[in-house]
Amino acid sequence: MSDDDERGEEYLFKIVIIGDSAVGKSNLLTRYARNEFNPNSKATIGVEFQTQSMLIDGKEVKAQIWDTAGQERFRAVTSAYYRGAVGALVVYDITRSSTFENVGRWLDELNTHSDTTVAKMLIGNKCDLESIRAVSVEEGKSLAESEGLFFMETSALDSTNVKTAFEMVIREIYSNISRKQLNSDSYKEELTVNRVSLVKNENEGTKTFSCCSR
Amino acid sequence: MDEEYEVIVLGTGLKECILSGLLSVDGVKVLHMDRNDYYGGESTSLNLNQLWKKFRGEEKAPEHLGASRDYNVDMMPKFMMGNGKLVRTLIHTDVTKYLSFKAVDGSYVFVKGKVQKVPATPMEALKSSLMGIFEKRRAGKFFSFVQEYDEKDPKTHDGMDLTRVTTKELIAKYGLDGNTIDFIGHAVALHTNDQHLDQPAFDTVMRMKLYAESLARFQGTSPYIYPLYGLGELPQAFARLSAVYGGTYMLNKPECKVEFDEGGKVIGVTSEGETAKCKKIVCDPSYLPNKVRKIGRVARAIAIMSHPIPNTNDSHSVQVIIPQKQLARKSDMYVFCCSYSHNVAPKGKFIAFVSTDAETDNPQTELKPGTDLLGPVDEIFFDMYDRYEPVNEPELDNCFISTSYDATTHFETTVADVLNMYTLITGKQLDLSVDLSAASAAEE
């Protein structure tokens, strides 16, 4: 995984999804990665991360998107979860204002554990439930502006904006990394010395920015 | 929290997290709690502010040391044997996907007043400056015997039954001198004292083979590997495994009082006025202080430095073992170092540890032979902590208590305790041998 000079290089970005329980984090992820939606999904069990690819400037860019595995339920998300994340989606439920009020705590936790996040997006999910909306679009927008986040309302149920939101984050990471890369190669080189792989790496020759871009 | 679980795990140290992960994968309904607001218990890695709070009682560390979050200082410094039980457990559970590792640069031993590289193969023995010319040849022959030795092939046994012959007798056969016996026993076989000399040689030979095979595995300059961001990542990775398989996690739960019925069997855990019911408890010694006894004390020093340990070929990660005899002590002293190249400190900084089984009440004086090897330090902390082992009978109370982490330099005894507990809890053996092929397939 160290052959950075190979032609046809690929990019692999780690993106985390955070936010209160039952705001639809897992359903956003499965809608984006598999175009599925499960109305009965309870607390997250068995979801790891999903890898999705997209083409940018003719290059294959892969996003490895992590789900909290239910550890957010009692606020026990590991610091390791945030390690090396270059993108983050902070999700709230537009029908429950408590989930919106907690966005600040999630941002604090993200900033405490990661200084590598270059693209963050605030997502108001369940926008198909307009009739019981509790957080207005304006409130979402203004919080995003004051915290320097992208903002979008989505619906994992009817697919509104889901693909757009993820791809916007991935594009933003890509443009940031490509620029940053010009200056950081020597330090990164130093950090990858002696790296060992315990399992056969399927993505050989893939650039991982999850832990090298510090 | 007022639910019923099959197993409640208390404490998120490495042992508890591995067990939690294995049990959840088996389909057991697990609740995992910790009184701290962070993962890892005794085996956590602290950031700079946490470190200051623990040792200096102050919330904030001096600014010149850099950002607090750039530090991950291990509270239980150890390295992982490249071919050891922890690596096999990681591969068996596929937890490797949450972690990145680096080979450790150097493995050294302090003999005759000098820090010297540990030779572990016949080739290295011949190049080593640890021994004179004739001793090198004798040691080379001994290493060849060990390398060839195959339990199942009597032709490689050289006419000896290693389950009967003692280590002392085996070594006598090759005519090795005291210093060679010292570095082989302590820096290759990684014994913590000299008891092995009077015990059957089989264990020592297998330990030497583990060292040599681990060394060969990553073609590095030591048999060890180490996770980026520190050892505190390990419990968290197993906790994620448990959560992915349905384990419930709660941090920052004060008290965590274990409740028993009149027969003395565990029935649940109470915290903040709520009781979660369970059939079994798995925990570290601190959660059931009445069911453990003290078995020893560890003295340690933690140093922040701006340079690698002198005389270790500028290694960014290194282990130096000081065998007991070299210091006229009863137990070995261990020196570890890792650096910013493992993401455990900001650029240019190194973290060094010195630890030993305490023989006095004054860690600063006792650890001096080890801290003297470090050169100048930016900051240094000294402390001591007690070690415990369980004295209860799990079949009577359904409490499964881990033993405190010992002073060994790697995770072999840690995982052995976990596997033993797993068998006690489930009645099943965890077979890690099947993964050997997977492990060797990963050789590159």
Curated annotation (Swiss-Prot), chain A:
NCBIfam families: small_GTP. A lipid is attached at C211, C212 (S-geranylgeranyl cysteine). Signal peptide: none annotated. GO terms for biological process: inter-Golgi cisterna vesicle-mediated transport; response to heat. Belongs to the small GTPase superfamily. Rab family. SUPFAM superfamilies: P-loop containing nucleoside triphosphate hydrolases. It holds the Pfam family Ras. Interacts (via C-terminus) with GDI1. Interacts with PUX8/SAY1. One of its GO terms (cellular component) is plasma membrane. This is Ras-related protein RABA5c. InterPro entries: P-loop_NTPase, Rab_GTPases_membrane_traffic, Small_GTP-bd, Small_GTPase. Keywords: Cell membrane, Golgi apparatus, GTP-binding, Lipoprotein, Membrane, Nucleotide-binding, Prenylation. It comes from Arabidopsis thaliana (Mouse-ear cress). It is found in: Golgi apparatus membrane; Golgi apparatus, trans-Golgi network membrane; Cell membrane. Its main location: Golgi.
Swiss-Prot record, chain B:
GO terms for molecular function: GTPase activator activity; Rab GDP-dissociation inhibitor activity. One of its GO terms (biological process) is protein transport. The keyword Transport does not apply. It holds the Pfam family GDI. Keywords: GTPase activation. One of its GO terms (cellular component) is plasmodesma. Coiled coil: none annotated. Expressed in roots and floral buds. Gene3D superfamilies: FAD/NAD(P)-binding domain (3.50.50.60), Guanine Nucleotide Dissociation Inhibitor, domain 1 (1.10.405.10), Guanine Nucleotide Dissociation Inhibitor, domain 2 (3.30.519.10). Regulates the GDP/GTP exchange reaction of most RAB proteins by inhibiting the dissociation of GDP from them, and the subsequent binding of GTP. PANTHER family: GUANOSINE NUCLEOTIDE DIPHOSPHATE DISSOCIATION INHIBITOR 2 (PTHR11787:SF19), RAB GDP-DISSOCIATION INHIBITOR (PTHR11787). Belongs to the Rab GDI family. This is Guanosine nucleotide diphosphate dissociation inhibitor 2. It comes from Arabidopsis thaliana. The gene is GDI2.
